[in-house]
Design a protein with these regions (language model features):
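Compact, glycine/acidic-enriched structural inserts
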Residues: 106-128
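Active-site helix-to-loop segments that bind/position phosphate- or nucleotide-bearing substrates
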Residues: 1-107, 111
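Flexible, glycine/charged-enriched surface loops at secondary-structure junctions
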Residues: 45-54, 130-146
Length: 163
């Protein structure tokens, strides 16, 4: 499903750049703003959301997908279902980043932070939408979790994308 992103939070961009509350230089502010505007014009955010019942063994029902590690199974232990959310900004975001990498490593780093903040914003919006839908069913969402967080291997990304 295509979604519309109207803003990319500057604070989140600064977080991805390792900012810890110190004053932000005017040149950096300008570069961030330029990349925010460019990204909002060029990206094509899309999401896929699927809800799966959980089998007693912790796998997603009717699949062989079992989240590895201890964190996710513990988080889902009292749950009846799990929601998989996949988000992308589209191929143009990757092309933008590749072009910027050939011009300036510093600017490419800033653009990468802008794009990372953009995909987080897309996921945040979807999470809010899902919270509302689940509340109507008297259900609640756990925290969002992704391969690479906690003890869930990043390699699970490829497996979860199949669903």
């Amino acid at each position: 499903m295509q979604v519309t992103l109207t803003q990319i939070p500057t604070r989140e961009i600064l977080h991805f750049l390792g900012w810890h509350g110190t004053p932000v230089e005017p040149g950096l502010k300008e570069t961030i703003k330029r990349f925010q505007e460019k990204a909002l014009r060029k990206i094509e955010p899309r999401v896929v959301v699927r809800e799966f019942e959980l089998s007693p063994d912790g796998t997603l029902a009717h699949t062989r997908f079992l989240p590895l590690g201890k964190d996710v199974p513990a988080m889902l232990s009292d749950c009846r279902s799990a929601v998989l959310l996949a988000a992308t900004l589209g191929a143009e975001s990757e092309r933008m980043l590749l072009r910027e990498q050939s011009r300036s490593a510093a600017d490419a780093l800033i653009l990468d932070a802008v794009l990372s903040a953009a995909v987080e914003a897309v996921c945040d919006e979807q999470e809010e939408r899902l919270r509302g839908e689940f509340a109507e069913r008297s259900l609640f969402l756990t925290d969002r979790f992704s391969p690479g967080y906690g003890d869930m291997p990043i390699a699970q990304s490829r497996k979860s994308a199949k669903f």
